[in-house]
Amino acid sequence: MSTIVFVLTLDEIDGVSVIMPQVKKEWAEQIIFVDGGSTDGTVEKAKELGFEVIHQKNKGEGNACRIGTDATQSDYVMFFSPDGNDLPEDIPKLIEKTKEGHDVVHISRFGKNSVSEDANWIERFGNYMFTFLVNTFFGGNYTDALNGFRIIKRELWDELKTDAQYLNVEQQTCIRLAKRKIPIYEIESIEPNRIGGERKMRPLTVGAQLSYQIIKEFIFWK
Protein backbone atom coordinates (compact mmCIF):
# COMPACT_ATOMS: atom_id res chain seq x y z
CA MET A 1 0.00 0.00 0.00
CA SER A 2 1.85 3.08 -1.28
CA THR A 3 1.49 6.73 -0.31
CA ILE A 4 2.74 9.92 -1.94
CA VAL A 5 2.92 13.07 0.18
CA PHE A 6 2.46 16.23 -1.86
CA VAL A 7 4.08 19.30 -0.28
CA LEU A 8 2.23 22.35 -1.59
CA THR A 9 4.30 25.54 -1.77
CA LEU A 10 4.34 29.13 -2.95
CA ASP A 11 7.14 31.23 -1.45
CA GLU A 12 7.53 29.21 1.75
CA ILE A 13 11.32 29.26 2.15
CA ASP A 14 11.14 29.98 5.90
CA GLY A 15 8.72 27.17 6.62
CA VAL A 16 10.44 24.71 4.30
CA SER A 17 13.80 25.36 5.97
CA VAL A 18 12.39 24.60 9.43
CA ILE A 19 9.73 21.96 8.74
CA MET A 20 11.05 19.73 5.97
CA PRO A 21 14.21 18.56 7.80
CA GLN A 22 11.75 17.10 10.35
CA VAL A 23 9.97 15.05 7.65
CA LYS A 24 11.45 11.56 7.38
CA LYS A 25 11.58 10.23 3.85
CA GLU A 26 10.89 6.68 5.04
CA TRP A 27 7.40 7.74 6.17
CA ALA A 28 6.09 7.47 2.60
CA GLU A 29 7.08 5.94 -0.72
CA GLN A 30 7.48 9.42 -2.22
CA ILE A 31 7.46 13.00 -0.96
CA ILE A 32 7.04 15.47 -3.82
CA PHE A 33 6.84 19.26 -3.85
CA VAL A 34 4.24 20.93 -6.06
CA ASP A 35 5.33 24.54 -6.40
CA GLY A 36 3.19 27.39 -7.69
CA GLY A 37 6.01 29.63 -8.91
CA SER A 38 8.08 30.50 -5.86
CA THR A 39 10.68 33.24 -6.24
CA ASP A 40 12.15 33.18 -2.72
CA GLY A 41 14.35 30.09 -2.99
CA THR A 42 11.72 27.53 -1.96
CA VAL A 43 12.37 25.30 -4.99
CA GLU A 44 16.13 25.46 -4.58
CA LYS A 45 15.82 24.57 -0.88
CA ALA A 46 13.53 21.63 -1.66
CA LYS A 47 16.04 20.25 -4.17
CA GLU A 48 18.90 20.84 -1.73
CA LEU A 49 17.03 18.69 0.78
CA GLY A 50 16.67 15.96 -1.84
CA PHE A 51 13.01 16.32 -2.79
CA GLU A 52 11.51 16.09 -6.27
CA VAL A 53 9.69 19.23 -7.45
CA ILE A 54 6.75 19.47 -9.84
CA HIS A 55 6.27 22.96 -11.27
CA GLN A 56 2.69 24.21 -11.28
CA LYS A 57 1.68 26.32 -14.30
CA ASN A 58 -1.50 27.73 -12.78
CA LYS A 59 -1.72 28.97 -9.21
CA GLY A 60 -4.08 27.72 -6.52
CA GLU A 61 -4.12 24.90 -3.99
CA GLY A 62 -6.81 22.94 -5.81
CA ASN A 63 -4.85 23.12 -9.03
CA ALA A 64 -1.70 22.00 -7.20
CA CYS A 65 -3.46 18.94 -5.78
CA ARG A 66 -4.59 17.81 -9.23
CA ILE A 67 -1.25 18.60 -10.89
CA GLY A 68 0.46 16.34 -8.38
CA THR A 69 -1.99 13.47 -8.49
CA ASP A 70 -2.28 13.52 -12.29
CA ALA A 71 1.49 13.20 -12.66
CA THR A 72 1.96 10.25 -10.31
CA GLN A 73 0.70 6.84 -9.23
CA SER A 74 0.11 5.46 -5.72
CA ASP A 75 -2.60 3.86 -3.62
CA TYR A 76 -3.03 6.92 -1.37
CA VAL A 77 -2.26 10.62 -1.70
CA MET A 78 -1.63 13.12 1.08
CA PHE A 79 -1.56 16.91 0.98
CA PHE A 80 0.77 18.76 3.36
CA SER A 81 1.67 22.41 3.87
CA PRO A 82 5.19 23.23 5.13
CA ASP A 83 4.22 26.73 6.34
CA GLY A 84 4.27 25.62 9.99
CA ASN A 85 0.52 25.09 10.38
CA ASP A 86 0.78 21.32 9.77
CA LEU A 87 2.73 19.14 12.20
CA PRO A 88 5.21 16.80 10.45
CA GLU A 89 4.65 14.12 13.11
CA ASP A 90 1.00 13.86 12.01
CA ILE A 91 2.10 12.43 8.64
CA PRO A 92 2.76 8.88 9.93
CA LYS A 93 -0.39 9.07 12.07
CA LEU A 94 -2.49 9.68 8.96
CA ILE A 95 -0.80 6.85 7.08
CA GLU A 96 -1.28 4.45 10.00
CA LYS A 97 -5.04 5.04 9.98
CA THR A 98 -5.26 4.01 6.32
CA LYS A 99 -3.59 0.73 7.28
CA GLU A 100 -6.46 0.25 9.73
CA GLY A 101 -8.91 0.44 6.83
CA HIS A 102 -9.89 4.12 6.57
CA ASP A 103 -10.16 5.52 3.04
CA VAL A 104 -9.99 9.18 4.14
CA VAL A 105 -8.29 10.62 7.22
CA HIS A 106 -7.76 14.27 7.98
CA ILE A 107 -6.48 16.56 10.69
CA SER A 108 -9.01 18.65 12.60
CA ARG A 109 -7.91 21.98 14.07
CA PHE A 110 -11.24 22.59 15.80
CA GLY A 111 -12.22 19.29 17.40
CA LYS A 112 -12.97 19.00 21.10
CA ASN A 113 -9.32 18.41 21.98
CA SER A 114 -7.76 20.33 19.08
CA VAL A 115 -5.84 23.58 19.43
CA SER A 116 -5.33 26.25 16.77
CA GLU A 117 -2.63 28.71 17.75
CA ASP A 118 -2.80 30.43 14.37
CA ALA A 119 -6.48 31.17 13.65
CA ASN A 120 -7.88 34.56 14.64
CA TRP A 121 -11.50 35.08 15.69
CA ILE A 122 -12.66 35.80 12.12
CA GLU A 123 -11.11 32.56 10.86
CA ARG A 124 -12.55 30.60 13.79
CA PHE A 125 -16.04 31.95 13.17
CA GLY A 126 -15.75 31.34 9.42
CA ASN A 127 -14.60 27.78 9.94
CA TYR A 128 -17.42 27.08 12.37
CA MET A 129 -20.01 28.59 10.02
CA PHE A 130 -18.90 26.79 6.85
CA THR A 131 -18.38 23.48 8.66
CA PHE A 132 -21.91 23.83 10.07
CA LEU A 133 -23.28 24.49 6.57
CA VAL A 134 -21.47 21.48 5.09
CA ASN A 135 -22.81 19.26 7.87
CA THR A 136 -26.35 20.65 7.61
CA PHE A 137 -26.82 20.72 3.84
CA PHE A 138 -24.74 17.72 2.81
CA GLY A 139 -24.96 15.35 5.76
CA GLY A 140 -21.37 15.68 6.92
CA ASN A 141 -20.08 15.00 10.40
CA TYR A 142 -17.03 17.25 10.46
CA THR A 143 -15.45 19.43 13.11
CA ASP A 144 -13.22 21.07 10.49
CA ALA A 145 -14.35 21.05 6.85
CA LEU A 146 -11.77 23.60 5.72
CA ASN A 147 -8.48 21.89 6.50
CA GLY A 148 -6.51 20.39 3.64
CA PHE A 149 -4.09 18.24 5.65
CA ARG A 150 -5.48 14.83 4.75
CA ILE A 151 -4.77 11.46 3.21
CA ILE A 152 -7.24 9.93 0.77
CA LYS A 153 -7.39 6.79 -1.32
CA ARG A 154 -6.35 7.80 -4.84
CA GLU A 155 -9.22 5.95 -6.49
CA LEU A 156 -11.66 7.88 -4.33
CA TRP A 157 -9.89 11.20 -4.95
CA ASP A 158 -10.20 10.64 -8.70
CA GLU A 159 -13.91 9.83 -8.37
CA LEU A 160 -14.60 13.14 -6.62
CA LYS A 161 -13.51 15.06 -9.74
CA THR A 162 -12.75 18.25 -7.84
CA ASP A 163 -12.54 21.43 -9.91
CA ALA A 164 -12.02 24.10 -7.23
CA GLN A 165 -8.87 26.04 -8.04
CA TYR A 166 -7.95 27.61 -4.72
CA LEU A 167 -8.29 26.97 -0.97
CA ASN A 168 -11.94 26.07 -1.51
CA VAL A 169 -10.80 22.63 -2.73
CA GLU A 170 -10.72 21.62 0.94
CA GLN A 171 -14.41 22.34 1.45
CA GLN A 172 -15.33 20.86 -1.94
CA THR A 173 -13.62 17.60 -1.04
CA CYS A 174 -15.55 17.38 2.24
CA ILE A 175 -18.85 18.20 0.53
CA ARG A 176 -18.43 15.57 -2.17
CA LEU A 177 -17.38 12.94 0.35
CA ALA A 178 -20.43 13.75 2.49
CA LYS A 179 -22.78 13.55 -0.49
CA ARG A 180 -21.40 10.11 -1.24
CA LYS A 181 -21.82 9.19 2.45
CA ILE A 182 -18.14 8.34 2.73
CA PRO A 183 -16.91 8.84 6.30
CA ILE A 184 -13.79 10.79 7.15
CA TYR A 185 -11.77 9.74 10.17
CA GLU A 186 -10.68 12.90 11.98
CA ILE A 187 -7.50 13.15 14.04
CA GLU A 188 -7.57 16.03 16.49
CA SER A 189 -4.29 17.91 16.52
CA ILE A 190 -2.54 21.22 17.06
CA GLU A 191 -2.21 23.96 14.45
CA PRO A 192 0.96 25.92 15.32
CA ASN A 193 1.59 29.46 14.13
CA ARG A 194 2.74 30.04 10.58
CA ILE A 195 6.51 30.26 10.10
CA GLY A 196 7.38 33.38 8.12
CA GLY A 197 6.14 33.99 4.59
CA GLU A 198 2.88 35.61 3.58
CA ARG A 199 -0.54 34.29 4.56
CA LYS A 200 -2.32 33.04 1.44
CA MET A 201 -5.80 33.13 3.01
CA ARG A 202 -7.83 36.31 2.42
CA PRO A 203 -11.00 36.03 4.56
CA LEU A 204 -13.37 38.01 2.31
CA THR A 205 -12.18 36.42 -0.93
CA VAL A 206 -12.16 32.89 0.47
CA GLY A 207 -15.50 33.45 2.20
CA ALA A 208 -17.08 34.46 -1.10
CA GLN A 209 -15.58 31.42 -2.86
CA LEU A 210 -16.85 29.07 -0.15
CA SER A 211 -20.35 30.57 -0.17
CA TYR A 212 -20.66 30.29 -3.95
CA GLN A 213 -19.31 26.76 -3.81
CA ILE A 214 -21.93 25.60 -1.30
CA ILE A 215 -24.71 26.94 -3.52
CA LYS A 216 -23.18 25.38 -6.63
CA GLU A 217 -22.61 21.99 -5.02
CA PHE A 218 -26.10 21.97 -3.49
CA ILE A 219 -27.79 22.67 -6.83
CA PHE A 220 -25.65 20.94 -9.43
CA TRP A 221 -23.31 18.19 -8.21
CA LYS A 222 -24.76 14.72 -7.65
Which residue stretches match the model-derived regions?
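Short active-site alpha-helical segment characteristic of glycosyltransferases
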Residues: 87, 169-176
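Short beta-strand/loop segment that forms part of the nucleotide-sugar
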Residues: 20, 28-37
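Catalytic donor-sugar/metal-binding loop of nucleotide-sugar-dependent glycosyltransferases
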Residues: 140-141, 165, 175-192
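Acceptor/aglycone-binding surface of glycosyltransferases and processive sugar-polymer synthases
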Residues: 57-59, 63-71, 76-79, 89-167, ...
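Short, well-formed alpha-helical segments that are part of the catalytic scaffolds
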Residues: 9-25
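Conserved donor nucleotide-binding strand/loop of the catalytic core
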Residues: 29-32, 43-71
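A conserved acidic beta->alpha catalytic loop
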Residues: 35-43, 84
